[in-house]
Amino acid sequence: MISRNIYKLAAVLMVLVTAFTVTGLSGCKSRTMSNEVTTEYDTPDDYNDERSGVTYGNVDEISYYSPTTGSERKACVYLPRDYDESQSYPVVYLLHGMSGSYSEYSRIGALYVAQNAVDDYNRNPVIMVSFTVFTDADGGQESDYDFSELTAKYDACEHDVINALIPYINEHYSTKTGRENTAIAGYSLGGRESLFLCFAHPDVFGYVGAFAPVGGVVDTGSGERVYGNRGFLLSELVKDGEEQPLITLIVTGDSDPYCKESAINYSDYMTSHGINHIFYIRLGAHEVSVWNNGLYNFIRIIF
């Protein structure tokens, strides 16, 4: 039987298709790609597989204290192959979408995707960290809230990430620090939060990947805050002369019924406001194949 959460997810995501429409941007195109399917960012057939004869790193399950929730929270730390504490590594923080958890990226094979990208393009090895984005000090579940309340609980991860998780990771693992060594990426609602966190904290994050991101970070022209009790707009976060991300990558599936338009609108908004970014559309719906494609291409161009 399909759970009520699946029906809820479909319903609220359908709202995004009609609610997130940026005004005054007709005719805008992405800086790098048109709003058509491209093969430029295609991946090898085995890009998300555990390849035969290839050694992969380990995944640590850790627990850290969160002042935001007043409790211990779990996270997964994905270590690169041959992790050596005498060396230091850049870090990528990974954010899941609605109904996900700290172990979601382990389930969808992020360890293999990242190592394969590093091997295929001779990139620097990275540490990745995934955590539960839903942050509720009251100990509630996602199903307890309507969508506006739910997104506010996702927004609350900001304080958890900045004040608790990142300090814990830097203390317990051999990491490189600074924006030039710290990235953030996510899919769906996690993509929305990744965009916000990167633009809100340019001193912390230098790279952002948004894979089929939910809308709500740019001005819809309605004068209202779109999602979440706090609300935020890129127009308030990006100021003339302030640092932009070193790399911003946005991808969506050509048949995504929920977030294709919001991804295009993000790209159009960034183009019209002079924010450098990579945007492309690939074959697929709102699904893992699109998100993992985004992660693979993100890993191969950062650091």
Predicted regions span which residues?
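Gram-positive cell-envelope targeting signals
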Residues: 1-37
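Non-catalytic cap/lid and distal C-terminal segments of serine-dependent acyl enzymes
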Residues: 29-303
